[in-house]
């Protein structure tokens, strides 16, 4: 357990992650006439920095920032910049390939240097990283009212208008919208057996698509993504889309491409200079066009629902929202329930609900392909409890501890949202003896939490039995938090758990999965983005 209070950093030369953040930016060659001016400027800036750090005394330890640029956020650089920076040569010199290292890994290494709670600066913004379960729980649960806000990130603010349920600021409007959204999703089956038939029905299409490949290798990404998206569509839109539907395929492509641009392109510079968003070329122009296309698609669906709304028999989330919106307008002229907010909530549900569960299932397929002994035990348990002919049910969960433990172990190792969604403090506070000022950006490193050797024995090993007791029964560990904890916990957690169990068991019941012969072992580092996605891989299937 983490001990409270500031800890002294080691006296010896720190390891490579700390050196990366403390290294000088390089020597400037100047003509003599500019030297004096530069020197005066540097003295002023260093004085400003020193005074600022004096004011911030008591914050968690961390690498010394440079004036203006702070630590320059090297640990958060996307691959397109990381490959072009001095970070690349220094990490390679340390024997690490920067192209496959995500920020969650670099931050975990820094925690070994500075402690489980440490800080760094991006420009003048203070960032505090929480690296173990106890600090995450104290912040997000015990001080939830202080740590539940979202930071004001220019790119996110422009794209989302700070609406929806994922990126909206913490307050009365967010609470109202989240409460309604969660209760409405539960009404349509979230976490209930009534949603089972839709998931099982969708698996039939997955099975048919996979069987088309016969014994040939194929990439399962689009098949899984289509299926997961359709389950969200059935809840939100009241319909599913055929996998060959051109509009549906285009929308999934737009959303995937939009996320890629936002997280791994020059568009990230919008967070420094917001006006860059409106540049008429390159990824800036492409992102704006994608926004227009997604907006057109979702607003057409909302309009269709308005025209066909049956007030006595609402069919889906949009119908329920429209009815609630009408009721609110009668009683509250300042209500936050309007078409624009509905649009952003639908976008949140569609994008976040698709990306997280899709990648969790893909990781499961990859780990089964890499661990045939574990896959065989899962097959045996499915055969014993369900057999070959009956579809799985959530009621089977209690009798399938090894299968459940296998899913949990995949989630532990791959934590699909490794740094959660960043939080922000809404007032000054103290966390384990450290001063955390108002407006501090908080990064809960869930990846680090799930690889903490103080909690998990041999944390790098894939070992489902760690979730089983001596009698082979499932152990519920409070330190297992792949969906986060606190007031901002993933709203779709129950849906994701249902989809993961029913889809995974259905896949294992129907097929055995393997990597193609003579193929290279896929990297297990993952691709950092909104979620931690596996690198592209192919698999082969054999009927069971």
UniProtKB/Swiss-Prot annotation:
The UniProt record lists the keyword Signal: no
Tissue: Widely expressed with stronger expression in thymus, heart and cerebellum.
Keyword field: Disease variant, Endoplasmic reticulum, Heme, Hereditary spastic paraplegia, Iron, Lipid metabolism, Membrane, Metal-binding, Microsome, Mitochondrion, Mitochondrion inner membrane, Monooxygenase, Neurodegeneration, Oxidoreductase, Transmembrane, Transmembrane helix
Membrane-related topology note: Multi-pass membrane protein
Catalytic activities: an omega-methyl-long-chain fatty acid + reduced [NADPH--hemoprotein reductase] + O2 = an omega-hydroxy-long-chain fatty acid + oxidized [NADPH--hemoprotein reductase] + H2O + H(+); (5Z,8Z,11Z,14Z)-eicosatetraenoate + reduced [NADPH--hemoprotein reductase] + O2 = 19-hydroxy-(5Z,8Z,11Z,14Z)-eicosatetraenoate + oxidized [NADPH--hemoprotein reductase] + H2O + H(+); (5Z,8Z,11Z,14Z)-eicosatetraenoate + reduced [NADPH--hemoprotein reductase] + O2 = 20-hydroxy-(5Z,8Z,11Z,14Z)-eicosatetraenoate + oxidized [NADPH--hemoprotein reductase] + H2O + H(+); N-[(5Z,8Z,11Z,14Z)-eicosatetraenoyl]-serotonin + reduced [NADPH--hemoprotein reductase] + O2 = 2-oxo-N-[(5Z,8Z,11Z,14Z)-eicosatetraenoyl]-serotonin + oxidized [NADPH--hemoprotein reductase] + H2O + H(+)
Any Pfam family matching the protein: p450
Pathway connected to this protein: Lipid metabolism; arachidonate metabolism
Subcellular location: Endoplasmic reticulum membrane; Microsome membrane; Mitochondrion inner membrane
InterPro entries: Cyt_P450, Cyt_P450_CS, Cyt_P450_E_grp-I, Cyt_P450_E_grp-I_CYP2D-like, Cyt_P450_sf, Cytochrome_P450_fam2
A Gene Ontology molecular function term of the record: oxidoreductase activity, acting on paired donors, with incorporation or reduction of molecular oxygen, reduced flavin or flavoprotein as one donor, and incorporation of one atom of oxygen
Keyword Iron-sulfur attributed: no
EC number: 1.14.14.80
Binding site for heme: 490
The organism's place on the tree of life at top rank: Eukaryota
Role: A cytochrome P450 monooxygenase involved in the metabolism of arachidonic acid and its conjugates. Mechanistically, uses molecular oxygen inserting one oxygen atom into a substrate, and reducing the second into a water molecule, with two electrons provided by NADPH via cytochrome P450 reductase (CPR; NADPH-ferrihemoprotein reductase). Acts as an omega and omega-1 hydroxylase for arachidonic acid and possibly for other long chain fatty acids. May modulate the arachidonic acid signaling pathway and play a role in other fatty acid signaling processes.
Protein name, UniProt field: Cytochrome P450 2U1
UniProt organism field: Homo sapiens (Human)
């Amino acid at each position: 357990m983490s001990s409270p209070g500031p800890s002294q950093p080691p006296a010896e030369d720190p390891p490579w992650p700390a050196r990366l953040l403390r290294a000088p930016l390089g020597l400037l060659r100047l003509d003599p006439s500019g030297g004096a001016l530069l020197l005066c400027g540097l003295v002023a800036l260093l004085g400003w920095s020193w005074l600022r750090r004096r004011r911030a005394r008591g914050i968690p330890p961390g690498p010394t920032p440079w004036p203006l640029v702070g630590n320059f956020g090297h640990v958060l650089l996307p691959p397109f910049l990381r490959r072009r920076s001095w970070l690349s040569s220094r990490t390679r010199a340390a024997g690490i390939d920067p192209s496959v290292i995500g920020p969650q890994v670099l931050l975990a290494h820094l925690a070994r240097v500075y402690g489980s709670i440490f800080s760094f600066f991006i420009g003048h913004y203070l960032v505090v990283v929480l690296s173990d379960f106890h600090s995450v729980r104290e912040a997000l649960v015990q001080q939830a009212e202080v740590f539940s806000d979202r930071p004001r990130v220019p790119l996110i603010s422009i794209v989302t208008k700070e609406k929806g349920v994922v990126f909206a600021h913490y307050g009365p409007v967010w609470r109202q919208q989240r409460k309604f959204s969660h209760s409405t999703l539960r009404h349509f089956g979230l976490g209930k057996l009534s949603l089972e038939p839709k998931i099982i029905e969708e698996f039939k299409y997955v099975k048919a698509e996979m069987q088309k490949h016969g014994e040939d290798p194929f990439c399962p990404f689009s098949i899984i993504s289509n299926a997961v998206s359709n389950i969200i569509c059935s809840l939100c839109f009241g319909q599913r889309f055929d996998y060959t539907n051109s509009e549906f395929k285009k929308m999934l492509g737009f959303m995937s491409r939009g996320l890629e641009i936002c997280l791994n392109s020059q568009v990230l510079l919008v967070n420094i200079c917001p006006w860059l968003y409106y540049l008429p070329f390159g990824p800036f122009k492409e992102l704006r066009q994608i926004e227009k296309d997604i907006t057109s698609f979702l607003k057409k669906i909302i309009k269709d629902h308005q025209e066909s709304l049956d007030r006595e028999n609402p069919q889906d989330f949009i119908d329920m929202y429209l009815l609630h919106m009408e009721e609110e307008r009668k009683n509250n002229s300042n209500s936050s329930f309007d078409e624009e907010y509905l649009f952003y909530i639908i976008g949140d549900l569609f994008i976040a609900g698709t990306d997280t569960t899709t990648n969790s299932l893909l990781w499961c397929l990859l780990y089964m392909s890499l661990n045939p002994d574990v896959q065989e035990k899962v097959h045996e348990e499915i055969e014993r409890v369900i057999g070959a002919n009956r579809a799985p049910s959530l009621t089977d969960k209690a009798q399938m501890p090894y299968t459940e433990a296998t899913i949990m172990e995949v989630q532990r190792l791959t934590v699909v949202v490794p740094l959660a969604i960043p939080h922000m403090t809404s007032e000054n506070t103290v966390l384990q003896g450290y001063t955390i000022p108002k407006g501090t950006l908080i990064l809960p490193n869930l990846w680090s939490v799930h690889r903490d050797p103080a909690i998990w024995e041999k944390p790098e090993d894939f070992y489902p039995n760690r979730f089983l007791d001596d009698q082979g029964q499932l152990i519920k560990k409070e330190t297992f938090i792949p969906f986060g904890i606190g007031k901002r916990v993933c709203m779709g957690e129950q849906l994701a758990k249902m989809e993961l169990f029913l889809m995974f068991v259905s896949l294992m019941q129907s097929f055995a999965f393997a990597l193609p012969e003579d193929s290279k072992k896929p990297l297990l580092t993952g691709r950092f983005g909104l979620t931690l996605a596996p690198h592209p891989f192919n698999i082969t299937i054999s009927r069971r």
